Amino acid sequence: MYDSEARQKTLNLTVSAVFVAILLLEAFIPNVGYITILPGLPAITTIPLTVAVFASLRGPKAGAAFGLVWGLTSLLRAYAAPNGLVTILLFQNPLIALLPRLAAGWAAGLAGQLADKWESRKPLAYALSGLLASAVNTLMVILLSDLVYFSHPQKLALALGAKSGQSLLVILFTALAVNGILEAVFSGLITPLITAPLKKRLKRR
C-alpha cells in the first residue's frame, strides 16, 4: 500500500511539473499561449485549455493552485513584456491578474470531477471544464476591472478605444467578450479530446 501511495505521489508531482513547464512555455514564447489579433488589446490565450486539462486530471484544489501559477505569469508578463497599455492597466494589478486565474482553475476542476459521476457523459464534463476555465477567467477579469477602475475609468476606457460617457462595464464586455467567446469555444471543444485519453493512460500506471 505504501508503494502504491508513493507511486501515486510521484506520478502527481510528475504530471504537475510537466504541466507547469507547458504553462511557462505558453506564457513566455510569443504567439504560443497568447496570440495578438488586435494590437493594443489583450491577446487571445490558449492557456485556459491547459488549465482545464490539468484541473480535470487533478481536481479543484490543484486546479486552483495551477490557476494561481498562470496568474503569476500574467502579472510578470504585464511588467516584463506587456503587449499594450490595456495589459499594463489590467494585469499589473495583482487582484485582476491572480484572482480570475485561480477561480478559473478551481471551477474547471469542479467540472472535471463530474466525469466520475457522469460515466456515459464524460466528454460533456470535460467540455464544461474547458468552457468554465475560459468563461470564469474572462468574466472575473471584466468585473474586477470595472470594480478597480469604477472611480477613475477614463484612462482604461480610452486605452480600449471607447468614447467618453460610455459605461466602463459595457466597454469591457465589448472589448473582451469576443476574445472570451473564442477562448471558451476552443477550450470546450479540445479539452475532452486531450483529457479523456490522458486520464485513461494515467490510470494504467
What are the residue ranges of the model-derived segments?
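Loop-helix junctions at membrane interfaces
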Residues: 1-205
